[in-house]
A protein has these predicted regions:
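Catalytic donor-sugar/metal-binding loop of nucleotide-sugar-dependent glycosyltransferases
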Residues: 136, 160-162, 171-187
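A conserved acidic beta->alpha catalytic loop
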Residues: 1, 24-33, 79
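Short loop->beta transition adjacent to catalytic acidic/histidine clusters or analogous donor-positioning motifs
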Residues: 12-22, 30, 43-46
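Short, well-formed alpha-helical segments that are part of the catalytic scaffolds
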Residues: 1-13
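Short beta-strand-to-loop acidic/aromatic patch adjacent to the donor-nucleotide binding site
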Residues: 70-78
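Acceptor/aglycone-binding surface of glycosyltransferases and processive sugar-polymer synthases
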Residues: 44, 50-66, 71, 83-164
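Short active-site alpha-helical segment characteristic of glycosyltransferases
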Residues: 81, 166-173
Length: 188
C-alpha cells in the first residue's frame, strides 16, 4: 500500500495524468488487500490479479495488456530505485526521441556500490547479449524501465519466458523490431 501511494505521490508531480496498474501475482500475504485499499484511496490505481504465481513475465504481460496511456513504466514494488528517477527517463525519451529508456547500474554516473566480482559477472553477461543478440544493453534487470506503448504492447504477449529472463527476451524483441533503447544511470 505505502509503495503504491508513494509512487503516485512522486510521479504525479511530473506526470499528472497517470495510471498505476499493480499486478498481484498470486501473493499469499495481504498484498491483494493492500492493493484494494490503494484503489479505494485513488481511482488511478488498478489491479490485475492472479490466484497463483505465474512469474514475472506473465505478470508484465497481464499489466501491459491493461495499459491505456502512451507510456509504460516498470517500477519494482520494493522501491529499491526511487520512482522520482522516472522523470529523467521520460526527459531522455522525449529529448532524444527514444522508444525505451532503461536504468543501468553499470554506467559511470550510477550511484551505487557493487562488489568487483558482480561487476565482472555482469560484464560477461553484457558481452554475451552483445554477441548473441546484438543487444547493446549493459543491464537488463534494473527495476526501472520506460517504454513507448507502441514499442512494448505489440511484443509483450509474444514473449515465452515467464521468469526474470523475460526482460532480456522483451528487450531483444523490441530491438529486433527496430525500436531504439537508451540507458541512463541509476541511483540506489
Amino acid at each position: 500500500y505505502h509503495s503504491i501511494m508513494e509512487t503516485l505521490r512522486i510521479v504525479e508531480k511530473f506526470v499528472p495524468e497517470l495510471e498505476i496498474i499493480v499486478v498481484n501475482d498470486g501473493s499469499k500475504d495481504n498484498t491483494k488487500a493492500e492493493i484494494e485499499r490503494a484503489i479505494k484511496q485513488d481511482s488511478r490505481v488498478r489491479m490485475v490479479s492472479s490466484e497463483k504465481n505465474r512469474g514475472k513475465g506473465n505478470a508484465i504481460i497481464a499489466g501491459v495488456s491493461q495499459v491505456e496511456g502512451k507510456y509504460v513504466a516498470f517500477v519494482d514494488a520494493d522501491l529499491e530505485l526511487n520512482p522520482s528517477q522516472l522523470e529523467g527517463y521520460l526527459k531522455k525519451m522525449l529529448d532524444d526521441n527514444k522508444d525505451v529508456v532503461i536504468g543501468c547500474k553499470f554506467l559511470k554516473d550510477s550511484k551505487l556500490d557493487y562488489p568487483f566480482k558482480r561487476k565482472v559477472i555482469s560484464m560477461g553477461y553484457y558481452i554475451m547479449l552483445l554477441v548473441l543478440f546484438h543487444l547493446n544493453v549493459k543491464d537488463t534487470q534494473t527495476g526501472l524501465k520506460v517504454f513507448r506503448v507502441e514499442a512494448i504492447k505489440p511484443v509483450a504477449h509474444l514473449i515465452r519466458t515467464s521468469g526474470f529472463a523475460y526482460d532480456i527476451e522483451l528487450l531483444v524483441a523490441i530491438h529486433r523490431r527496430g525500436f531504439s533503447i537508451a540507458q541512463i544511470p541509476v541511483e540506489v
